[in-house]
Amino acid sequence: MTVRGDVLAPDPASPTTAAASPSVSVIPEGSPTAMEQPVFLMTTAAQAISGFFVWTALLITCHQIYMHLRCYSCPNEQRYIVRILFIVPIYAFDSWLSLLFFTNDQYYVYFGTVRDCYEALVIYNFLSLCYEYLGGESSIMSEIRGKPIESSCMYGTCCLWGKTYSIGFLRFCKQATLQFCVVKPLMAVSTVVLQAFGKYRDGDFDVTSGYLYVTIIYNISVSLALYALFLFYFATRELLSPYSPVLKFFMVKSVIFLSFWQGMLLAILEKCGAIPKIHSARVSVGEGTVAAGYQDFIICVEMFFAALALRHAFTYKVYADKRLDAQGRCAPMKSISSSLKETMNPHDIVQDAIHNFSPAYQQYTQQSTLEPGPTWRGGAHGLSRSHSLSGARDNEKTLLLSSDDEF
């Protein structure tokens, strides 16, 4: 028998299980303690609730993607819109799978890698969509070139006092977003490698852990990309006003950037003990996994609301009437499949990255081409007019981008 204060406690080796006093409860050997009880993330309820939100979000977004492909009347814009919309299925389903394999901390890292790689592309595609809305670089420069950049500490432009908008400004915005498309996948691959060698744990800020360095690099990269997006919006907010840019900017930033800071906060809370860890002889859960599990559950729920907001922000209805033929019919299924193939082709991303980081950037232009109108409406006259306008805009584009202005 051992003594704790004034209360006698039975010796662990003794077969006696009787309580020494009413205030002492003795748990038989082999019974799970309170800490060994499954947490909410490990229950069927958590998987069912998250699954309901995930599959509902998938249905909403997949229908919206289908309608965009069915009414694929403006490929230069809808290509980017469809790519942005795919963030909901990828984020939601990936997070749900991570939650299902919550007790295996290796699987959720692999699932997160797929999610991380795709979110980098969303930033680029959103900026490219804004460029397309405004007609390309030459059209943007014709509106903002030479105007002074308003200096404001609130908007983060105080360091740009005395500078004016130039082609270098647009180049910086593109490069800052493209670097995120490179850094994010590299960090995702590094995470998998470090995880395989036991050098990575979510929420482990020790100097010997790869999590600390991956987080620092990612913070710098994501902050730079966010700053570039904000600078571009700050410069073109009046030009973008017909396209309801506020909701679009908010949704893209919240889905990608806020989810990152949300995960960071949960990791810090677990490190500080605000989120209890799981200590069980039957379940092996690594450090940081509980915070990552809550992050996955929250994302599953958030993607449902993101799907609703994105459905309103990137509606297909503005393109529906443009796709009707003479009989009022939309594109057949074959056209939908070919449109999807064109949307998923990353050729434009690779080409744009090469040109934006090339020393010969001044000779490069990103200019939306005017599509010839349907033959039953404009005929050959409409086609020749499109070519003449395109040639005129090309001349303007050459004059604008031959400048050696730097940002």
Curated annotation (Swiss-Prot):
Main location group: membrane
A Pfam family the protein falls into: Solute_trans_a
Location of region: Disordered: 1-25, 369-395
SMART domains named among the record's database cross-references: Solute_trans_a (SM01417)
Highest taxon above the source species: Eukaryota
Topology of this chain in the membrane: Multi-pass membrane protein
TM segment ranges: 40-60, 84-104, 121-141, 178-198, 214-234, 249-269, 290-310
Keyword Amino-acid biosynthesis attributed: no
GO molecular function annotations of the record: transmembrane transporter activity
Sorted UniProt keywords: Membrane, Phosphoprotein, Transmembrane, Transmembrane helix
Extent of Low complexity compositional bias: 9-25
InterPro entries hit by this protein: Ostalpha/TMEM184C
Phosphoserine sites (modified residues): 388, 402-403
Gene Ontology CC annotations of this record: membrane
Family to which this protein belongs: Belongs to the TMEM184 family.
Its job: May activate the MAP kinase signaling pathway.
Protein name (record): Transmembrane protein 184B
Lineage of the species this protein comes from: Eukaryota, Metazoa, Chordata, Craniata, Vertebrata
